[in-house]
Structure formats: structure tokens, C-alpha cells
């Protein structure tokens, strides 16, 4: 069990798993070979080698193919959005025109109350001063 752990530690540290397995398994294989036949010894030598061998996952190639396929798709949704945006630019603003007409109508109303006040002011100026003439008569 300690040798298996040593193999795992060695594999994670980046040492050559083949060279380390040959050194670690040779004494372990010699002990069972002395008591048993050569077949279990061969099985003992193959087991650690399979445990340290790591196969690479070959899933990147299909993902890369799908990524390349994504790049070459045409963007069909952007074209209608652009057409709608151009249509928005050419619409006439119908609500703004009546508001402008109402504003122009406000400017042309006659101010009737200031005219009445001016008329009253003119009437004040033309009153005769009767009190001033009386002291001059004395």
C-alpha cells in the first residue's frame, strides 16, 4: 500500500512514472515470485503501471469543430433589427406638429386687460385740476 501511495506522489510531482515503477515494483515482484508462480508476479507488475498511466480525453476535437461552426454562421437576426431601426428614422412626428400649432396660437392672442389699464391711465391724465384754480382766484 505504501508503494502505491509513493507511485501516486511521484506521478503528481512530475517524476517519470516508468522509471519509478521499475524501481519500486522490482523488490515487490521478487518476494511473491519466490513463493508463487510467475503469473501473479506478472499481474503485480502490470497493475501499478496501469494505475499511473493517464489517458488524455479526446473531447476537445468535437468542441473545436463546433466552435469553428459557430464562427461561420450568418447573423440573421441583426438584419431585421437594422431594418426596423431605419424605419424608425423615417417616421413623421405627427404629435409634435399640433403642439407647435397650439404654441403659435398662444403667441397671437391679444392682451385685452393691459389695454384697459392703459385707457384708465390716460383718463387720469386728462382730468381737470379744479383745486389749483380756486387758490389762484383769491
From Swiss-Prot:
Compositionally skewed regions (Low complexity) per UniProt: 31-50
Pfam families (alphabetical): Asr
NCBIfam families: acid_shock_Asr
Post-translational modification: Proteolytic processing gives rise to the active protein.
Keyword Transmembrane helix: no
Biased composition (Basic residues): 51-77, 122-131
Major localization listed first in the record, in broad terms: periplasm
Gene that produces this protein: asr
Signal peptide extent: 1-21
Species per Swiss-Prot/TrEMBL record: Serratia proteamaculans (strain 568)
UniProt family annotation: Belongs to the Asr family.
Residue ranges, annotated region (Disordered): 31-138
Keywords: Periplasm, Signal
Function comment: Required for growth and/or survival at acidic conditions.
InterPro entries found in the cross-reference section: Acid_shock (IPR023497)
Propeptide residues according to the Swiss-Prot or TrEMBL record: 22-85
Protein's name according to its UniProt entry: Acid shock protein
Localisation per UniProt entry: Periplasm
GO cellular component: periplasmic space
Amino acid at each position: 500500500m505504501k508503494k502505491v501511495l509513493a507511485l501516486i506522489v511521484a506521478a503528481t510531482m512530475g517524476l517519470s512514472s516508468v522509471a519509478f515503477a521499475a524501481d519500486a515494483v522490482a523488490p515487490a515482484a521478487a518476494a511473491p515470485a519466490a513463493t508463487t508462480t510467475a503469473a501473479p508476479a506478472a499481474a503485480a507488475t502490470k497493475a501499478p503501471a496501469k494505475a499511473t498511466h493517464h489517458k488524455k480525453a479526446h473531447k476537445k476535437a468535437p468542441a473545436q469543430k463546433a466552435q469553428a461552426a459557430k464562427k461561420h454562421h450568418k447573423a440573421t437576426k441583426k438584419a431585421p433589427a437594422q431594418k426596423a431601426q431605419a424605419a424608425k428614422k423615417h417616421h413623421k412626428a405627427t404629435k409634435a406638429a399640433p403642439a407647435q400649432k397650439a404654441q403659435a396660437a398662444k403667441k397671437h392672442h391679444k392682451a385685452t386687460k393691459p389695454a384697459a389699464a392703459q385707457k384708465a391711465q390716460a383718463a387720469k391724465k386728462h382730468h381737470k385740476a379744479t383745486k389749483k384754480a380756486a387758490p389762484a382766484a383769491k
